[in-house]
Regions:
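Periplasmic-binding protein-like
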Residues: 129, 141-143, 169-177, 200-204, 210-211, 282-291, ...
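A bilobed periplasmic-binding-protein/Venus flytrap-type ligand-binding module shared by bacterial periplasmic
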Residues: 145-152, 187-190, 259-272, 291
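Short, polar/charged alpha-helical segment
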Residues: 39, 44-70, 80-82, 86, ...
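Extracytoplasmic ligand-binding site segments that recognize negatively charged/polar headgroups
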Residues: 45, 49-56, 76-82, 94-226
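A ligand-binding cleft/hinge motif common to bilobed small-molecule-binding domains
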Residues: 105-109, 227-247
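Bacterial signal peptide processing site
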Residues: 23-25
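C-terminal motif of bacterial Sec signal peptides marking the signal peptidase cleavage site
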Residues: 18-21
Length: 291
């Protein structure tokens, strides 16, 4: 199941879904870090909500490929990133030269605010047309799946099975206000035949609990707080590789596919414009994709 580029109707539904919340996200992953050469002559500010492991590897790879650019990184959840961008706009203007998000919905809203500089990147024939616009480009394909506690029986076979009384109070959901991929899932279920807002209402009625972030879903299932959850397949794979007692449950009606977009902002000017374009080229290159 592929998530489309943008769903304007999803935001009101985010406010109406009414799934029980456990609390707001904390900015534990937000930081200002840098990867640079001591002789750096250009500065680049990156705002991102991608996983820490991903951004660390990519920025380190870029520093090796282009040591003349110093990259300062602000990483946070999608909700915190949106708040930072709004604060920038109310205090002198956007400070990010590049924004790298985890869902197309949030990036589309930034594009509508005219925060991005249109630039058709050259030499990127391998990027599917569905994963790029005039303003931003898809960098990684993400999949939302079900994570289950190891040994759980019976296992759910479909997304709708999460509303079964057999799993009452045992399902964890990521907060759409904090996690871009969770927001994308909300947008998908809103428009998918057989789901709609009623799916979230059924989850709520079945005792599903909303937690702060995508990684927290996996952690809570691993620790036995819940038996099931909705999360990214990459988080489940990493947890399994680390020995966590969880398994990945790929629904028979399909995982939810979305992409992680990146864009140059209108704040990137002069040398920052050159650095931003170099960074985008790297992220979308084979080296950046394999970082």
């Amino acid at each position: 199941m592929r998530f489309p580029l943008a769903r304007g109707a999803a935001l009101p539904l985010l406010l109406a879904a009414g799934v029980a919340a456990c609390g707001s996200a904390t900015p534990t992953s937000a930081s200002s870090t840098s990867a640079s050469s001591t002789s750096a002559s250009q500065q680049l500010t990156l705002y991102t909500s991608v996983t820490q492991n991903t951004v660390t590897a990519v920025v380190a790879g870029f520093a090796t490929a282009d040591p003349g650019v110093k990259v300062s990184v602000f990483r946070a959840t999608t909700g915190q990133l949106n708040a930072r961008i709004t604060a920038d706009q109310h205090s002198g203007g956007l400070r990010a030269d590049v924004i790298w998000g985890t869902d197309p919905l949030s990036m589309e809203s930034f594009a509508q605010e005219h925060l991005f500089r249109p630039w058709p990147l050259p030499g990127l024939a391998g990027v599917p047309a569905a994963d790029k616009t005039t303003y931003f480009w898809g960098t990684r394909e993400l999949y939302l799946v079900i994570v289950a506690r190891k040994g759980l029986t019976p296992m759910p076979r479909t997304w709708s099975d999460l509303t079964s009384p057999a799993y009452r109070g045992q399902v964890a959901l990521p907060d759409p206000a904090a996690a871009g991929s969770a927001f994308a899932a909300l947008g998908y279920f809103d428009t998918a035949p057989g789901f709609g807002l009623g799916f979230y209402q059924a989850l709520k009625a079945n005792g599903a609990v909303q937690v702060a972030t995508i990684p927290e879903v996996v952690t809570d299932v691993a620790q036995g707080r819940y038996q099931l959850g909705i999360t990214l397949d990459s988080e489940v794979r990493a947890a399994i590789a680390a020995g966590s007692p969880v398994v990945m449950d790929w629904p028979s009606d399909g995982a939810i596919s979305l992409y992680s977009p990146i864009a140059e902002t209108v704040a990137a000017a002069g040398a920052a414009n050159t650095a931003a374009q170099a960074f985008l080229r790297y992220v979308l290159s084979p080296a950046g994709q394999n970082a």
